[in-house]
């Protein structure tokens, strides 16, 4: 969503926070017993899109940058993708076994493939429209992938590939559910799309906060309402994750009132058919990214957002503060005990015990 770009810089300036230093240890009662934070690198950079590729953490960033950090070699590789005089911002990233894909926000929308071996960059999709703004991208398998963007007409902009990312096709509006006026998506952490097998969930915000579901890899869709706060441009679902095909969690809130802790978290036990609020007045306010902890039986969740890093071990009802650093936008797990978080000016490793 375009307005999120403007609010991000303002939000960082206005928020007051205490940063946890490297190797800070946080103890909490059960579940995990401690967490330490290792800074992998710092730079003048904004990162909202990361993925784990074996020993590498790939990222898309602002100022036309992408790269990776090699966890084994402790080295960073970074490159720019120059397109005329444009300063691209990559907020969507996805991968196949051979390539990493980067998708820019705003107009024009530019989607690039990057060969993992030789780092060769190729433009595979371009869309020009004053309203174009892509928010998230994922792959079902090595051949099929999907990206979601704000409506340019009266439905989400959805592009798919069936040939490993070589070509992308935009789904016609008459094949998609109609969006409400003012309903779009947020490019907060590349978590607007969640895939489990063939099941696909898309989440929306703004005037409506809904979940769009496809059981057949974007061929047909159903839509359900959620109780998440909605009605204003910067309210709704900013992030989602599913532990399996049945258990999911959505979060977000009101970006302009980041301390609001009600109607901002919900869970499902039936694959997204119904959603129930949880954790009212508990834990965080605005959420940028939520992720289930691997091996946590759908009960353990990590959130990064307006109040730092928080952890729940009971499905989102109660939350423990792990860090008050509000500069993280996105997080991904490597395994149960290790995650990578990125955001404003840094990428770190979170170590849980």
Give the positions of each predicted feature.
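Bacterial Sec-dependent N-terminal signal peptides
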Residues: 1-32
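Beta-strand-rich domains and repeat architectures in extracellular enzymes and scaffolds
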Residues: 39-64
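Short glycine-/Asp-/Thr-/Trp-enriched loop segments that recur within the blades
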Residues: 41-42, 84-88, 129-134, 177-187, ...
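Blade-level signature of beta-propeller repeat domains, shared across WD40, Kelch, NHL, RCC1
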Residues: 333-353
């Amino acid at each position: 969503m375009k307005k999120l770009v403007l609010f991000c810089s303002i939000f960082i300036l206005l928020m007051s926070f205490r940063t946890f230093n490297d190797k800070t240890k946080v103890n909490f009662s059960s579940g995990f017993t401690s967490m330490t934070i290792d800074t992998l690198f710092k730079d003048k950079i904004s990162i909202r899109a990361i993925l784990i590729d074996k020993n590498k953490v790939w990222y898309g960033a602002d100022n036309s940058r992408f790269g990776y950090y090699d966890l084994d070699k402790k080295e960073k590789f970074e490159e720019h993708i120059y397109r005329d005089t444009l300063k691209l911002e990559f907020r969507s990233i996805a991968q196949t076994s051979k390539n990493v894909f980067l998708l820019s926000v705003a107009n024009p929308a530019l989607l690039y493939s990057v060969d993992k071996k030789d780092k060769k960059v190729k433009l595979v999709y371009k869309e020009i429209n004053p309203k174009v703004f892509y928010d998230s991208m994922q792959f079902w398998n090595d051949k099929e992938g999907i990206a979601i963007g704000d409506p340019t007409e009266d439905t989400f902009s959805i592009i798919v590939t069936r040939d490993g990312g070589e070509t992308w096709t935009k789904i016609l509006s008459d094949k998609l559910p109609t969006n409400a006026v003012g309903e779009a998506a947020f490019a907060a952490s590349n978590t607007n799309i969640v895939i489990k097998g063939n099941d696909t969930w898309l989440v929306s915000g703004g005037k409506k906060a809904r979940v769009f579901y496809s059981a057949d890899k974007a061929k047909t869709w159903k839509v359900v309402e959620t109780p998440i706060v909605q009605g204003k441009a910067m309210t709704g679902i900013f992030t989602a994750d599913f532990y399996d095909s049945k258990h999911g969690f959505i979060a977000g809130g009101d970006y302009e009132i980041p301390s609001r802790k009600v109607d901002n978290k919900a869970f499902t036990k039936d694959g997204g058919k119904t959603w129930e609020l949880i954790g009212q007045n508990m834990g965080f306010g605005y959420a940028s990214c939520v992720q289930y902890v691997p091996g946590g039986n759908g009960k353990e969740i990590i959130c990064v957002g307006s109040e730092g890093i928080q952890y729940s071990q009971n499905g989102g009802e109660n939350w423990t503060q792990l860090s008050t650093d509000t500069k993280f936008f996105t997080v991904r797990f490597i395994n149960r005990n290790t995650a990578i978080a990125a955001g404003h000016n840094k990428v770190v490793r979170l170590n849980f015990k």
